[in-house]
Swiss-Prot record:
Ranges that cross the membrane: none
Name of one Pfam family that matches: eIF3g
Quaternary organization: Component of the eukaryotic translation initiation factor 3 (eIF-3) complex. The eIF-3 complex interacts with pix.
Subcellular compartments: Cytoplasm
Gene that encodes the chain: eIF3g2
Entries under PANTHER family matching the protein: EUKARYOTIC TRANSLATION INITIATION FACTOR 3 SUBUNIT G (PTHR10352)
The name this protein goes by in its record: Eukaryotic translation initiation factor 3 subunit G-2
Alphabetical keyword list: Cytoplasm, Initiation factor, Protein biosynthesis, RNA-binding
Species whose genome carries this gene: Drosophila yakuba
Family, similarity comment: Belongs to the eIF-3 subunit G family.
Principal location listed in the UniProt entry: cytoplasm
GO cellular component, one term: eukaryotic translation initiation factor 3 complex
Biased composition (Gly residues): 173-183
């Protein structure tokens, strides 16, 4: 604290030498009033009156013994209770001590596995997907895609032009077998189960294309067209499915499907000349 110059005559008349009257306290009923004097930051003398409420309570023996300890050091002459020069009385904080068993029960309640853990894949709600009220509706995009894929696959299998039997490539129409259009030219690639996906974004990668078509059915080959200089996607790709019905399902499901803020266009791959 800064030292302030006071008149010695005033100090003698007031019967104190530090420029401040002595503190006093008195008890009235259940309240104790403590009056103190001090200098503020502006050098002015201020009077501070603190009020304490006296309450009688039963405390543990350890607390009672601790309160009866003899003060030491610079506080050895202080009166019982807190000293305003060394202790600041703040608001009372209530603490509750619980045992280890109660602590474990509290944590088990907070870590309830049935709360705030489940997340629905359909509507992103806080419940399991099997209990979603929108399951099977238009919001269930996975169910809708599976329905379209199954319908397209069934239509491809029920095509009367297909017998369902295995036909070697050289025996197919236009193949390299006897009587075929390409007899003597060598083996030609089969594009009957290939689809062309266009209107792709420039940031499209092979991993994204794999993620897009892997749920429809197995595929044998993929080709993503890229620019030679920049390496960015040209906007189209080819996917060769293992089965023709999966290719038909891909057209039914992905054609007109929104992906990366663009509407995809999926169609049968045209034979290369």
């Amino acid at each position: 604290m800064k030292a302030f110059n006071t008149s010695w005559a005033d100090e003698v008349d007031a019967d104190y030498v530090d420029g401040l009257p002595p503190s006093n306290e008195y008890i009235e009923g259940d309240y104790k009033y403590v009056t103190e004097y001090k200098f503020n930051d502006d050098g002015k003398k201020v009077k501070v009156v603190r009020t304490f409420k006296i309450e009688k309570q039963i405390v543990p023996k350890a607390v009672a013994r601790r309160r009866s300890w003899v003060k030491f050091g610079d506080s050895r002459l202080d009166k019982p209770g807190p000293n305003s020069q060394t202790t600041m009385a703040s608001e009372e904080i209530f603490m509750q001590f619980i045992g280890s068993k109660e602590f474990d029960q509290t944590h088990e309640t907070q870590l309830d596995p049935g709360k705030n853990i489940a997340k629905c894949r359909i509507c992103n709600g806080e419940h399991w997907s099997v209990n979603c009220p929108y399951k099977g509706t238009s919001m269930d995009s996975k169910t809708m895609m599976e329905t379209k894929a199954n319908a397209a696959a069934a239509a491809a299998i029920s095509d009367p032009s297909k017998t369902g039997k295995y036909v070697p490539p050289f025996m197919k129409d236009g193949g390299g077998g006897p009587g075929g259009k390409n007899w003597g030219r060598g083996r030609e690639r089969d594009d009957s189960s290939a689809v062309r996906i266009s209107n792709l974004s420039e940031s499209m990668t092979e991993a994204d294309l794999e993620e897009l078509v892997k749920k429809i059915g197995p595929h044998t080959k993929m080709y993503l067209a890229r620019e030679k200089n920049t390496g960015l996607c040209k906007g189209f790709a080819y996917v060769h499915f293992k089965f023709r019905q999966d290719a038909a399902a891909a057209i039914e499901v992905l054609n007109g499907h929104g992906y990366d803020h663009l509407i995809l266009c999926v169609e049968w791959s045209k034979p290369q000349p």
